[in-house]
Amino acid sequence: KLKRFIFYRNYGKDKVLEWGSGLSTPQIAERVAFLVSIEHNAEWYEKIKKNMAVSKKSYDNCKLLLRPPTRGGKGESVNTYWGEGPFKGQLKTMAGQNHYEDFKEYVDAPLNEGPFDIILIDGRARVACASKCHLLGHKDTLVFFHDFGVFGIPYYSECFEYLEPYGSVKSMARFKI
């Protein structure tokens, strides 16, 4: 149901932003007018870029951007961990507005690329990304937040300051700006 909802619809006229490039990036690019996909990990970025280059399909409508973290070297995760609470010991890099400084270039990369009709949040510094959506969209922009329910609402609760809930399918939450 989730794949059908996101990947198998044709959003041919839409301009889409994806924070967190992945194996679905080519599938999305095939179904939209234009895709901006931002990745923080250099090795993963090269893999996605190579996979798209060797494909027989044209991805001229896709702009892949590499934006490594400010701290953490060559695009690997900045290893900060939750110190207490239900997520004690788990990596903290995917959440939290406080990670904006670690991923500033990644979060801010699309600011001159919008407006976008659809925004997909599936990478690092997710709350920081959510906080920028109002600058990147319009009144009808839909925001899809992958794995929103996996860690529990408290993990990403700051997102409700920036986005209005609009439904969900499994672990994919849908919001409006």
Predicted regions and their residues:
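SAM cofactor-binding core of SAM-dependent methyltransferases
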Residues: L2-T80
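N-terminal start-of-chain detector that recognizes signal peptides
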Residues: I6-Y11, V36, L91-T93, F116-D117, ...
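A short linear-motif detector with a strong N-terminal bias
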Residues: D14-V16, N98-H99, D122, I153-P154
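Exposed alpha-helical structural elements
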Residues: R4, K47, D102, Y155-E158
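Short, surface-exposed linear patches
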Residues: I38-N41, S58-D60, F87, D140-F145, ...
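C-terminal substrate-binding/active-site "lid" region of AdoMet-derived donor-dependent transferases
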Residues: Y106-I177
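Internal catalytic-core helix/loop-beta-alpha segment
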Residues: L64-K132
